[in-house]
């Protein structure tokens, strides 16, 4: 089959349309604000975000198992005020906080403080109250990830 026959074939048209449809979302402009961070800070932040996602999953798993106080302890240790500043001893180029736009950094701080609020409620052992607090915590995550990107 010649190149001209391939280009004129229905298979080629279907392939081209499929390729265009699959790549269109990737080519669409991302409306989130780009936070320009040094590569080392990007890696630090991405590693931290993956860890926090795992922690949120563990917290939800603990709540399902009615281990509410344990969920609160984990939230405070891994996400709360206790987790703030853990990158302070790293070289500047690896520290995401000081390189973030001010509003993005403030959302991060709000996330830590909201995790501490969740932990305080969970310390009571009242699962319903803890579950009622959880959307506030996850809502801060959603707000930041919906507003900012690092690539």
Language-model segments: residues:
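N-terminal secretory signal peptides that target proteins for export/translocation
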Residues: 1-9
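Sec/Tat signal peptide C-region and signal peptidase I cleavage site
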Residues: 24-28
């Amino acid at each position: 089959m010649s190149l001209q026959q391939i280009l004129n074939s229905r298979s080629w048209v279907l392939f081209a349309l499929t390729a265009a449809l699959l790549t269109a979302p990737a080519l669409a402009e991302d409306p989130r604000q780009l936070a320009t961070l040094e590569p080392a800070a990007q890696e630090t932040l991405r590693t931290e975000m993956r860890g926090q996602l795992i922690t949120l999953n563990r917290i939800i798993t603990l709540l399902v198992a009615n281990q509410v106080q344990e969920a609160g302890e984990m939230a405070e240790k891994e996400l709360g005020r206790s987790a703030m500043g853990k990158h302070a001893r790293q070289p500047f180029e690896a520290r995401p906080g000081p390189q973030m736009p001010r509003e993005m950094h403030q959302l991060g701080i709000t996330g830590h403080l909201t995790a501490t609020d969740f932990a305080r409620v969970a310390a009571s052992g009242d699962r319903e109250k803890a579950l009622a607090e959880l959307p506030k915590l996850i809502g801060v995550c959603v707000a930041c990830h919906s507003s900012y990107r690092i690539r």
